[in-house]
Amino acid sequence: LARGQRVIFTTTTKIWQPAQQAFDLMLLAPDLTQALLQLQARTDWRSACVVAGADPAAAEIGVLAETRFLERDSVNHMPVLPHKMLGYAPDAICTALAYSPSHCQWVIEADGARGALLKAPDAHEPMIPACVDGVVVVANRDVIGQPLARPRVHRPEIVARLAGLALGEVMTPQAFMRVITHPQGGLKSLPPNAVRGLLLTGSPCDVPMVAGVFDWVMTVDD
């Protein structure tokens, strides 16, 4: 946005419905290609959220003017409403990119942690489109020094195996980075030519970096 480009946000999983002020436009469209054609025809937006629709397993979607928010998203502090929205299959996103408006960047949420500080992916995760040219791995350093257990850790059994710890053991900086840099952890299913970024949130602390794993590292201190 700061460079004058447009941004489209979507997901391959489920997200909380962004509140009205989070984006210039929000489109609910089962067909992503049709949604992009609509965006091409409009000039009244710089940021847009595009989702397939409401999650039928969740409560009925509320109106966008609703003012009852959940806590803001823990990573980007985006205000959200208490309704889950469905995204698109990774292949559908890659197919639809041919219809993307010009001078437009995409942000695609491809995995979720159910509000936990750290997670490891299950067999079907993460759902990263093969066509993306960059992937950002996100983890919260506040899990360091805490027991390896729910609710701080999502899929703790898998995290424990990758970290080399037992369930309930204290998460160390070394174990934290083992999960993030493991081929079945933070590096799972990354497209081979994609730029690899690491975003560390939470309280500042020293973590051992492994050279050559990520192309860039950014910290956001809470």
Labelled PLM ranges:
Residues 2-60:
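N-terminal phosphate/diphosphate-binding loop that engages ATP/GTP or pyrophosphate donors
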Residues 10, 64, 107-108:
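Structural recognition of the conserved hydrophobic beta-strand(s) that form the central parallel beta-sheet
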Residues 14, 28, 82-105, 110-221:
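Conserved catalytic-core segment of NTP-binding enzymes
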Residues 35-88, 95, 101-104:
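Ligand-binding beta-strand-loop-alpha-helix segment within the catalytic cores
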Residues 19, 74, 208:
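Short acidic, gly/pro-rich beta-turn/loop elements at beta-sheet edges
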